[in-house]
A protein has these predicted regions:
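Short loop/turn segments that connect beta-strands within beta-propeller blades
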Residues: 6-9, 48-52, 90-94, 137-140, ...
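Residue-level detector of Asp-centered blade-edge/turn motifs that repeat once per structural unit
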Residues: 31-34, 72-75, 119-122, 162-166, ...
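Conserved beta-propeller blade signature
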Residues: 35-38, 76-79, 124-127, 167-170, ...
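Residue-level "micro-hotspots" composed of small/polar
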Residues: 1-27, 31, 60-64, 97, ...
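Short beta-strand segments and strand-loop junctions that repeat across beta-rich extracellular domains
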Residues: 44-48, 120-122, 163, 177-179, ...
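Loop/turn residues immediately N-terminal
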Residues: 1-3, 42-45, 82-86, 131-134, ...
Length: 344
């Protein structure tokens, strides 16, 4: 008999006896000083440990149990679902409401898919949906981009990422386009030859060096400067080869954390990778598309296919110091002691 050793570097979040994320596929998280909001394929969960409040939301209270995104905006949480549109959670009353807008039934906000919700620096709220890209300000729709009325490459919009120059990178099922704030329009003719704009991109991330990381649905990560004058694929021959990147985030030491469909890695941008696995406390090597959060105390929170896991700032990026040698005590072949074992 044996027990696999785990260092406890990562921990799986629980708020017992009310909630345990163990074995839960976590797709969206929001973490503030006191509140945690966790979205999964099994509904939505709100936790406030300081005030000892907990509430779960599932069908039939929700139109869909599959939560795709959570975004904190003006004191409330906006929740995007797969097939159930948008909900707004008021954390003071722990009540849900629909997103109020004119012609609600003709939008995806009741029964459509809402993949991403973000705000820009002007306070506008953008929604990436199965019916194009929406923009709202002060509760009123000011834009709705579709493939018919704009340069949007596809109706299914998966993500929108605003960079430090205020440009918005729009990720669709058929490739990229750019929201140009100087002209208030979408553009698809700004990309140089050899760029990744025709691929299906999961998300775009800007690091502290103002480099953009494009995570394609399949293939190697693509890296570019903001002006798209210099770009490249991530070098081959790394632990990421053959894996699909699901998310990327930079920590306080300037390293990148990259979650894939087969493992979690910390990368120093110079060719050095640190892999993490079951021994480090990961419940599963399979990560799904869930953008991580770094809270005020420096703790990192990740969505995993088997729970919401976290890494405190004291443990950030460090492997356990203790190494345990493997010792073979017996060898069995088809349930019987082998000749080697008898000789030893």
């Amino acid at each position: 008999d044996y027990t696999l050793y785990q260092s406890g570097l990562f921990s799986t979040y629980a708020y017992l006896p009310y909630f345990d994320s163990k074995e839960m596929p976590v797709r969206a998280i929001a973490v503030s000083k006191d509140e945690k909001l966790i979205g999964s394929r099994n509904g939505l969960f709100y936790i406030d440990e300081k005030k000892q409040r907990f509430k779960s939301f599932k069908v039939p209270e929700l139109r869909s149990n599959m939560i795709l995104c959570i975004y904190a905006f003006e004191g409330k949480y906006y929740i995007g679902t797969y097939g159930g549109g948008i909900y707004i959670l008021n954390p003071s009353t722990l009540t849900l409401s629909d997103f109020e807008t004119a012609d609600l039934k003709s939008t995806p906000f009741l029964k459509g898919h809402v993949f991403c919700i973000k705000s820009d620096d002007e306070g506008s709220l953008w929604m990436a949906t199965s019916m194009g890209l929406y923009c709202y300000r002060d509760g009123k729709q000011i834009r709705h981009y579709t493939t018919e009325n704009s340069k949007l490459p596809g109706e299914n919009v998966y993500d929108i990422c605003f960079d430090s120059t205020r440009k918005g990178w729009i990720c669709t099922e058929n490739g990229l386009c750019i929201w140009d704030p100087s002209t208030n329009s979408l553009k698809s003719d700004m990309f140089p030859e050899g760029f990744i704009h025709k691929d299906k991109i999961r998300t775009v991330y800007e690091d502290s060096n103002h480099e953009l990381y494009f995570l394609p649905d399949k293939g190697a990560i693509f890296i570019s400067d903001l002006s798209m004058n210099h770009f490249r694929r991530m070098q081959s021959g790394t632990p990421l080869d053959g894996k699909d990147a699901m998310f990327i985030i930079e920590d306080h030491e300037g390293w990148l954390w990259i979650g894939t469909n087969l493992g979690l890695y910390r990368y120093d941008k110079k060719g050095n990778f640190i892999p993490y696995n079951f021994v480090d406390g990961l419940p599963s090597s399979i990560f799904i598309t869930c953008f991580p959060v770094i809270d005020e105390e420096g703790t990192m929170w990740f969505g995993n296919s088997k729970g919401m896991i976290y890494l405190t700032s004291e443990q950030n990026g460090r492997k356990a110091k203790w190494h345990y040698p493997v010792a073979i005590t017996d060898v069995l072949v088809n349930g019987k002691q082998s000749v080697y074992a008898k000789m030893s």
